[in-house]
Amino acid sequence: MGDVEKGKKIFVQKCAQCHTVEKGGKHKTGPNLHGLFGRKTGQAPGFSYTDANKNKGITWGEETLMEYLENPKKYIPGTKMIFAGIKKKGEREDLIAYLKKATNE
């Protein structure tokens, strides 16, 4: 899988403006991502999701995140995440490696 340190840099550049990862972290424009792996879409307590996110019904894991992060609006039409996606597979792998570690600490 990807490189955790490279993934952290990608998170800081592309995700941290809207998301936190630490346990008990606050929601920003996007939800706190702690405990993301193994959780269904639209389930972070206290965050106001669109129906599209709540109704997608998939469980977040490496494969689902690879697809989602490539093109969020294609994967979940109606999501309010304003992010074009990460086209480079290696960058997505690095980000997912970081998320897997950081959202589980």
Curated annotation (Swiss-Prot):
Modified sites of kind Phosphotyrosine: 49, 98
GO biological processes: apoptotic process; mitochondrial electron transport, cytochrome c to oxygen; mitochondrial electron transport, ubiquinol to cytochrome c
Modified residues annotated as N6-acetyllysine in this record: 73, 100
PROSITE patterns: CYTC (PS51007)
Gene3D superfamilies to which the protein is assigned, alphabetical: Cytochrome c-like domain (1.10.760.10)
PTM comment, free text: Binds 1 heme c group covalently per subunit. Phosphorylation at Tyr-49 and Tyr-98 both reduce by half the turnover in the reaction with cytochrome c oxidase, down-regulating mitochondrial respiration.
GO molecular function, one term: heme binding
Positions of modified residues (N6-succinyllysine): 56, 73
Binding site for heme c: 15, 18-19, 81
Cellular compartments per GO CC: mitochondrial intermembrane space
UniProt keywords, alphabetically: Acetylation, Apoptosis, Electron transport, Heme, Iron, Metal-binding, Mitochondrion, Phosphoprotein, Respiratory chain, Transport
Keyword field contains Metal-binding: yes
One family name in Pfam for this protein: Cytochrom_C
Subcellular localization, as worded in the UniProt entry: Mitochondrion intermembrane space
Residues that bear N-acetylglycine: 2
Function: Electron carrier protein. The oxidized form of the cytochrome c heme group can accept an electron from the heme group of the cytochrome c1 subunit of cytochrome reductase. Cytochrome c then transfers this electron to the cytochrome oxidase complex, the final protein carrier in the mitochondrial electron-transport chain.
Family in the record: Belongs to the cytochrome c family.
UniProt-recorded name of the protein: Cytochrome c
Native species: Bos taurus
